Regions:
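Extended, low-hydrophobicity, polar/charged segments
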Residues: 1-204
Length: 204
């Protein structure tokens, strides 16, 4: 902050009752890293069976475009020596954050990953696919529909769709470690803290 003035009077948003162990870890990660103004909402069990308009109402999102998800992608053609994700510019895995209303574009993602690698990875050695459930669980520690960058078991390099940064108001929603827990925050604050790459990675 500027000049060390105290935090706002509100402090962090409360952890919803019944948020679960993983949800508590995500909450603690956000608080520890100083992500201000986030909100957590416990969704009803039928959340994923219902349309986006229903989900928007549950969390209080400004529009269906503000509902986003984190997907772990794997380069299935990565060379033998490329196994992990220690180097964010040269990684076998990326966690990509996109809107539910947008479709991830594999070719755009491939081009972006190719650019990050700076010549170390020829395009024919890139084929980005959704990871299997088993790999997802091992890398993230989260179940399907609960994946999130916060408190993730492995530090997977992050890519966020540039469209999320253009949302107005600047407050988007993500999974939060448990299937029925959602978290919302400003893209600007999220980027400051978690420092994802910003990419044009969805269909126009």
């Amino acid at each position: 902050g500027g000049g060390g003035e105290p935090d706002g009077p509100e402090g962090p948003a409360p952890l919803p009752e019944g948020a679960g162990e993983k949800g508590a870890e995500v909450w603690a990660d956000l608080v520890e890293r100083g992500v201000e103004g986030f909100r957590m909402v416990l969704a009803p069990p039928e959340y994923y069976q219902r349309p986006l308009e229903f989900r928007m109402g549950v969390v209080g999102a400004a529009s269906v475009d503000h509902l986003c998800k984190s997907i772990v992608m794997e380069n299935t053609r990565a060379p033998e020596e490329l196994q992990g994700c220690e180097d964010p510019t040269y990684s076998k895995y990326y966690m990509v954050i996109v809107q539910y209303t947008a479709k991830l574009n594999a070719e755009k993602l491939k081009s972006f990953v190719h650019g990050l690698a700076g010549g170390r990875l020829p395009k024919k050695k890139i084929n980005m696919r959704l990871v299997s459930e088993e790999v997802n669980d091992r890398l993230t520690g989260f179940a399907h529909n609960a994946v999130t960058p916060m408190a993730c078991a492995t530090q997977i390099p992050l890519i966020i769709s540039h469209k999320i940064l253009a949302l107005s108001p600047d407050f988007f929603w993500l999974g939060s470690g448990e299937v029925d827990l959602k978290v919302g925050f400003s893209a600007e604050k999220f980027i400051q803290v978690y420092q994802p790459y910003v990419a044009d990675c969805t269909n126009d």
